[in-house]
């Protein structure tokens, strides 16, 4: 049923501009029009990462459910976890439209949304009534006009502490001017110190410690990766998400849309993001949790991220082309791949192709 929905839905949605289509997909999930997917609870896929119990390693990346409108509906598609946001303290409209572009030949997407969202309070109101064991992460960012961006991240930690299962500090979007400057070593040190101090303060009050991840860009030099790894380890951060969208346009077939400004995601970013993932795994060692994201379109590509060093994986853009049945197919496909590999846990395959990916150039 989901397969036929995918084919009909894609044809219909692709007649619309991408942002309108996205809004309609959110509305469909809200109204229950999208069929749910019952994935088997394969114990081999279960992971304990950063103290959280994931039924399977596949998550919905931030960017789809910016305003926490459909986290529970997304979990019913087969995802083991989902991440809302990016949310900023104040509502902001983002950049002018058009700001999302499909690269159909490449199965990629370029966006220059600019953290458009309804702000902390709107997302918090939607998250507070949610009950259940589903893992919902909160991706936090800074307002475009903020005079103190680090304070915006601290505000996100404090505001969502009662509802987040984990936090992601997003400092890697290319669509907010100057945001990626927070990846520079001195700025990153100040950010991590402030964010983790706020987390520890809230943890002392709440009696629970919520893990904090850092989402980084794929457009990093070797020196830049060295600096990030050093600061992450020095501050005892809980984990990394590798990676956000890229500014690179290497190898694209659609040279017309490729000229649009913004971050590229989907299948074209798989290789670059996986190389950076492996290089970061090599730098931070075996213990630090890493979530791999970028170009995951199948069980095979999800497993390749894990082989390159990821504990968990996320997807988003490839669902634009594959439809809402994709997470269920990926999870079922991972079980079949584990049958073939004859392993008791998917964790046994982590890092099995680390050197292959880490030795490649970005």
From Swiss-Prot:
Reactions performed catalytically: (S)-dihydroorotate + a quinone = orotate + a quinol
Segments forming a coiled coil: none
Listed EC numbers: 1.3.5.2
A GO MF term: dihydroorotate dehydrogenase (quinone) activity
Binding site for FMN: 62-66, 86, 139, 170, 215, 243, 266, 295, 316-317
SUPFAM superfamilies named among the record's database cross-references: FMN-linked oxidoreductases (SSF51395)
InterPro entries: Aldolase_TIM, DHO_dehydrogenase, Dihydroorotate_DH_2, Dihydroorotate_DH_cat, Dihydroorotate_DH_CS
Keyword Oxidoreductase: yes
Biological pathway: Pyrimidine metabolism; UMP biosynthesis via de novo pathway; orotate from (S)-dihydroorotate (quinone route): step 1/1
Active-site residues per Swiss-Prot or TrEMBL entry: 173 (nucleophile)
Entry keyword set: Cell membrane, Flavoprotein, FMN, Membrane, Oxidoreductase, Pyrimidine biosynthesis
Family annotation (HAMAP family): DHO_dh_type2
UniProt xrefs under PANTHER family: DIHYDROOROTATE DEHYDROGENASE (QUINONE), MITOCHONDRIAL, DIHYDROOROTATE DEHYDROGENASE (QUINONE), MITOCHONDRIAL-RELATED
UniProt name for this protein: Dihydroorotate dehydrogenase (quinone)
Protein's organism: Rhizobium rhizogenes (strain K84 / ATCC BAA-868)
